[in-house]
From Swiss-Prot:
The keyword Zinc applies. One of its GO terms (cellular component) is male germ cell nucleus. This is Nuclear transition protein 2. Residues 90-114 have a biased composition (Basic residues). It comes from Rattus norvegicus (Rat). Changing H24Q: 50% loss of zinc binding.
Length: 114
């Protein structure tokens, strides 16, 4: 009877993941979050040993949390970005003029290349 009970739960999740492949990808997101808190609570002293390990997953967490608040903050930085863009555009125009002279020189070398 014990073996049957153990076999039941093991077979249950198997068909579950197979029938729901999309859910698997969604679960991965929640899994990584769970894994983080699990690994931190499960390996408190180990956290100092695998220093290079957690840092790789660490940046992923702030990225996710930054995405949500970054949307509203982006709107505020939009005008700032526009100002920098305008400055860059005017600079680019001057560079483009210079590039045109370069292009004329390149044309002669381009003929040779052809």
């Amino acid at each position: 009877m014990d073996t049957k009970m153990q076999s039941l739960p093991t077979t249950h999740p198997h068909p579950h993941s197979s029938s729901r492949p999309q859910s698997h990808t969604n679960n991965q997101c929640a899994c990584s979050h769970h894994c983080r808190s699990c690994s931190q609570a499960g390996h408190p002293s180990s956290s100092s040993s695998p220093s290079p390990g957690p840092p790789t997953k660490h940046p992923k967490t702030p990225m996710h949390s930054r995405y949500s608040p970054s949307r509203p903050s982006h709107r505020g930085s939009c005008p700032k970005n526009r100002k920098t863009l305008e400055g860059k555009v005017s600079k680019r125009k001057a560079v483009r003029r210079r590039k045109r002279t370069h292009r004329a020189k390149r044309r002669s070398s381009g003929r040779r290349y052809k």
